[in-house]
Structure formats: structure tokens, C-alpha cells
A protein has these predicted regions:
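Short secondary-structure boundary micro-motifs
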Residues: 1-3, 28-30, 56-63, 91
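Beta-sheet-rich sandwich/jelly-roll-like modules and their strand-loop junctions
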Residues: 1-43, 95-114
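Solvent-exposed, low-complexity segments and loops of surface/extracellular structural proteins
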Residues: 10, 52, 84-86
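Surface-exposed loop/turn positions
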Residues: 24, 81-84
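Terminal beta-strand-rich extracellular "head" domains
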Residues: 35-82
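Short beta-strand-plus-loop segments that form exposed binding edges in beta-rich domains
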Residues: 88-96
């Protein structure tokens, strides 16, 4: 699933959201900014039906100061069902330059039908 939040970033909840189309397991979460943050790292959160997937908050996708890519991150909660709503929160922005044009990819492996 792909999410996009256009423009200069501000902290806030439900910046972008989408419905999951099938049952499965999240295998990675990645984030990208077209303009790098400066002064502070950029941190996002991904929620399923309003609750964070990253119960260990230190594991949230983070883009380093002056960077544009997060590393691939595996959330603590990986199971999703058809109809679940995934949403993106922007928790921390750069303190000098916020960062702009956020892209987030949540990769989901479809559950095997038995």
C-alpha cells in the first residue's frame, strides 16, 4: 500500500489513510521525503484502525537529519484483515527544515487461502 502526503510536512494524525484489500501480514514499512529534514529526525507512525502498529515507539520509521529514506522497518503488529484502515501519522518533523512530500510504502504479504 502506498501513501502520499504532499507539501511541507507538519506534525499530525491521519495525514493519509487507506483500506486494506485482503488479509495478510505486513513485511515492511518504508518512508521517503523529497526534501530532507534538518535540525531533527523525521518520525512517522502507522496505525491500524486507530491504534499504532509500533507498540515499541523507538521502532517507528525514522528519516535521519539530512536524509531522505528510512530503513525498512517491521512493526510489532503485523496482521491485517480485509477492511482494516491503515493511517499515517507524522509524529516529529525537522526543527529547522520540516521535510516535504512524504511517501510511505507498507508492504503486505497476502495470506494463503486454505
Amino acid at each position: 500500500m502506498r501513501f502520499h502526503v504532499a507539501g511541507t510536512q507538519t506534525a499530525g494524525v491521519k495525514k493519509s489513510a487507506a483500506l486494506v484489500g485482503f488479509a495478510g501480514e505486513i513485511i515492511s514499512v518504508r518512508a521517503h521525503l523529497d526534501t530532507a529534514p534538518t535540525g531533527a529526525a523525521f518520525v512517522i507512525d502507522v496505525n491500524k484502525n486507530g491504534t499504532t502498529l509500533f507498540t515499541t515507539q523507538a521502532n517507528r520509521p525514522t528519516i535521519a537529519i539530512a536524509g531522505t529514506e528510512s530503513t525498512s522497518t517491521l512493526p510489532d503488529v503485523v496482521s491485517v484483515a480485509a477492511g482494516d484502515r491503515l493511517s499515517i501519522d507524522v509524529d516529529v518533523i525537522g526543527s529547522s527544515v520540516a521535510g516535504s512530500d512524504l511517501y510511505v510504502t507498507v508492504s503486505i504479504k497476502r495470506a494463503t487461502v486454505q
